[in-house]
Amino acid sequence: LVKKERMITLNTQSPLLNKEAKTKLNRWPSWIGYAAIVWSALYGALHLYWLFGGGGYPFKNDGIGAALVSLLPAKVSSIVFVTVCLIGIGVGLVMRKPTYEAFSRWFAIAYSWGFSLTLLLLIPDTKLIAAMAYAFLLKFDFSWQIFNQIICIVGALLWMMTAVVYQRKTRYACEYCGRNNDEEPFFLVRWGRLLTVIAALSPVPYAIVRFAWALDIPLGIDPQLLRDFSSVNPMAHITEMVFGSLCIGGGLLTLGLIQKWGEVFPAWFPFIGGKRVPVMLAVIPASIVAIAVTAAGLTFTFNFITEALHLMPVDNLFISQDWGIAGPMIFWGPWGVALGLAAISYYYRRRGRCSSCGKG
């Protein structure tokens, strides 16, 4: 009986059975590391160009919503990026041949995750989430600064997935799904409901303030400033209403990560009613919003703390005197983190059988 079970296990993981999976374009574990190396080389070369006086340097400290990396002088920032990208090329090459020595393994993992989190949290600023929000008003502001932020987010995702593949390899798990002989579910699955509720409720304070302004209620803001803003911008009331509605609508959609209608389209949906919701249809938008919101929230939280502790000059108009402008954005950090983790939990809960190892 034991021999038969072993034979069955070998057959389900045989190359013949998984031929279809290996011929598809989903062989990302085989090329993701090379993509991260190429990205590091190109972006490092770009910063080398800026280091020697090239034009187009994207990190500008232009106010309270500026990225945290803009606090560094341009020369210092470019030197740091050139150095880190060069190290990344070396680490990436080493990770192509996994080592099982504890120090080497953990250094590669720490570098990959550290670099990716730096690119995600310190590079994007409030321009990214603002551009996404104003797109719903048919206002498109796509500058070089925003494009550079997208480049850095792509690099962060490449290094993040490279780290995931490397960790899976070095613990003898499937590179595609991360499963091994341990059948324990991913730990975030147990926290999925709580994370989703936090992510759904976090934008509510911001929405309340925006709805109040749309109704000419000076909640958390000087009444004269609200009147002046409305007189200068004829679209102010519509803008506030749209921004508040986006937060409430986003919160309701977030609840779909733990609701039945987040797995199967409701029957009243035309054409697709009753069909299963593709996993990535929920994961990808949630992840994009999570990245933008977390970066913006970190920027505002940092400015709020530095102003409160008098560590550096910050425009008091936006933080001290009129808390309604920046106060609700303190919740953006927890909102983004909770939304990102909730999306990961949703993915691991709903993913099916792995086409590579056959487990699931």
Protein language model features and the residues they cover:
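Membrane-interfacial, low-structure loops and terminal tails that flank and connect transmembrane helices
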Residues: 8-30, 102-106, 169-194, 267-275, ...
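An N-terminus-focused feature that recognizes amino-terminal "leader" regions
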Residues: 22-154, 166, 343-350
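Hydrophobic alpha-helical membrane-insertion segments
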Residues: 36-47, 111-122, 198-210, 282-299
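Membrane-helix interface motif
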Residues: 45-61, 123-135, 208-223, 260-261, ...
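Short, membrane-exposed interhelical loops at transmembrane-helix boundaries
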Residues: 61-68, 134-141, 224-232, 308-324
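Transmembrane alpha-helix entry/boundary detector in multi-pass membrane proteins
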Residues: 64-83, 226-251
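Individual transmembrane alpha-helices with interfacial aromatic-anchor signatures
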Residues: 72, 139-154, 189-190, 318-333
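Membrane-water interface of transmembrane alpha-helices
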Residues: 86-97, 161-172, 250-264
